[in-house]
């Protein structure tokens, strides 16, 4: 033995295994840049294709106007012919269903929603004609499919994970509420789409604004200045794009303005927090009094201009409802505002009339659903039901049922609501920016309706904030999944729980899909879906 040599007494280090076998396999599968690019784009494309199949399959069934299609499809058809919504004879639906689609009148129809959503429906009518029920619904189906792609890309930006993005898109693709609202030609799917597009623009603006604010402050401090308030950032193209998107949402339904207001407030808060992180003393005052007015001017006027543009057909024609109101004796404004052109006086009167209609709407309806019960999924909307006889519509032995019920996948919905409630707690504890942004989407789509619990409203309005519920659920799934650096036990458990949840959600969607797509089923099978008495 060499003098002075020492013998190590340190034993082998017991290193706990990390990750899972699935992680190892996935790592080998994506071991090349080409494969990673394929997953990066292929995953979102695959869930979008799945969404397209579920929304387009047998889209023309039933060949009958469903629920509020009686208003919006016929309005869209007259928009194509007149540029404004015109009236129809009473009880005209049977004729329209039978292909006699040109019985409309030249008299204007009183409509209480802006025209944009109906113009979108009209695109399908223009391509396929009004005698083809596929043409009635194709625009809405395409919009619903594109919404899945947008949500997937938004989720990847939020969570920096293609896996979580694909999970979010998959849940949106297979959810029944999203499927039904993409398979009927009504307005709310378009409202959801444009609001989600605005959300995506707000997300992009958040990073754009933060980077430029930091650069401007660094430049000021490098020059020896000591700014207390910080600069105003005027060039914010993503914010302008958000204004366009929210204006388009409002051009479908006025509730699009809820998203404009909610995210307008959100932008002030985000700017204040960004200035505080950058060490500005007057961060709150600067956000409200300095950047706030600039943000308002970049967002709100843009939205209003886009909203007004959605009424172009009404402005450029002469026969729209109330189009010539101000020109009738005794109606024109007098005094301070007498200079306002008559067309604008008529327009403002029409908008006031629409507002009065909505706030006073309290007519009973069998599927009216109080907003207080929306999150519990108490009263979903039955949009269409038929009992075909033996030998008709694929019924092998009566009694049979065909239904279009706008009900979410119950597992996905209730899990998403629970996740959103957890995110409220998490926001209080952690202040994560992703959590705040997601909850603002939920709040903008849901909370304003709590002011109107006495009005006639419906569960299907929740499509407007469904994407944000799904983002909340995806956020929680990400927490359950954990990271590759977690212990093997924790990581394997997280993967297993997530896999079981996704499999159960898929099975339930397969179970419910016939009732989302007007597929003929035995009456006993339809009855199996009445989990609550209020679901009938």
Task: List each language-model region with its residue ranges.
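Start-transfer (signal-anchor) and selected internal transmembrane alpha helices
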Residues: 1-54, 290-303, 492-498
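Aromatic-rich transmembrane-lumenal/periplasmic boundary elements in polytopic membrane proteins
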Residues: 58-97, 284-287, 294-295, 303-379, ...
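Transmembrane-helix motifs of polytopic, lipid-linked glycan transferases
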Residues: 138-159, 197, 419-423
């Amino acid at each position: 033995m060499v003098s002075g040599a020492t013998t190590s007494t340190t034993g082998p280090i017991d290193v706990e295994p990390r990750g899972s076998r699935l992680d190892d396999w996935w790592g080998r599968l994506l071991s090349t840049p080409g494969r990673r690019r394929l997953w990066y784009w292929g995953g979102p494309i695959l869930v979008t294709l799945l969404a397209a199949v579920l929304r387009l399959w047998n889209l023309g069934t039933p060949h009958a106007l469903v629920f509020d299609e009686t208003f919006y499809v016929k309005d869209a058809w007259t928009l194509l012919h007149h540029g404004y919504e015109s009236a129809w004879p009473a009880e005209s639906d049977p004729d329209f269903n039978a292909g006699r689609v040109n019985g409309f009148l030249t008299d204007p129809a009183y409509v209480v929603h802006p025209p944009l959503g109906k113009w979108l429906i009209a695109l399908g009518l223009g391509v396929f004609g009004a005698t083809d029920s596929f043409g009635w619904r194709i625009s809405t189906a395409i919009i619903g499919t594109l919404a899945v792609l947008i949500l997937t890309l938004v989720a990847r930006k939020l969570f920096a994970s293609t896996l979580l993005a694909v999970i979010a898109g998959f849940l949106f693709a297979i959810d029944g509420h999203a499927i039904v609202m993409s398979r009927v030609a009504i307005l709310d799917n378009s409202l959801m789409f444009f609001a989600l597009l605005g959300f995506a623009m707000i997300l992009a603006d958040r990073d754009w604004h933060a980077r430029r604010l930091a650069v401007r402050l660094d430049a000021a401090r490098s020059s020896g200045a000591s700014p207390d308030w910080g600069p105003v950032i005027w060039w914010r193209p993503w914010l302008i794009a958000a204004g366009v998107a929210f204006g388009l949402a409002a051009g479908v339904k006025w509730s699009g303005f809820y998203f404009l207001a909610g995210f307008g407030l959100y932008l002030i808060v985000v700017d204040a927090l960004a200035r505080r992180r950058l060490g500005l003393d007057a961060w709150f005052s600067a956000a409200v009094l300095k950047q706030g007015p600039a943000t308002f001017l970049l967002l709100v006027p843009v939205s209003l201009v886009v909203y007004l543009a959605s009424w172009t057909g009404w402005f450029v024609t002469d026969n729209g409802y109330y189009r010539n109101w101000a020109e009738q004796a005794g109606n024109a404004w007098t005094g301070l505002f007498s200079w306002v052109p008559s067309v604008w006086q008529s327009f403002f009167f029409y908008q006031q009339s629409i507002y009065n209609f909505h706030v006073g709407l309290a007519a009973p309806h069998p599927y009216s659903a109080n907003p207080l019960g929306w999150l519990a999924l108490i009263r979903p909307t039955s949009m269409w039901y038929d009992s075909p006889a033996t030998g008709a519509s694929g019924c092998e032995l009566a009694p049979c049922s065909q239904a279009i019920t706008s009900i979410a996948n119950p597992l996905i919905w209730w899990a998403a609501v629970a996740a959103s409630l957890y995110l409220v707690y998490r926001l209080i504890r952690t202040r994560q920016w992703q959590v705040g942004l997601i909850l603002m989407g939920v709040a903008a789509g849901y909370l304003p309706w709590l002011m109107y619990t006495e009005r006639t409203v419906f569960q299907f309005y929740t499509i407007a904030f469904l994407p944000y519920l799904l983002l909340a659920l995806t956020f929680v799934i990400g927490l359950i999944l954990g990271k590759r650096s977690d212990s093997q036990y924790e990581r394997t458990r997280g993967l297993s729980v997530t896999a079981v949840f996704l499999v159960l959600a898929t099975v339930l969607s397969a179970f419910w899909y016939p009732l989302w797509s007007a597929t003929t089923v035995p009456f006993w099978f339809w009855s199996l879906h009445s989990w609550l008495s209020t679901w009938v």
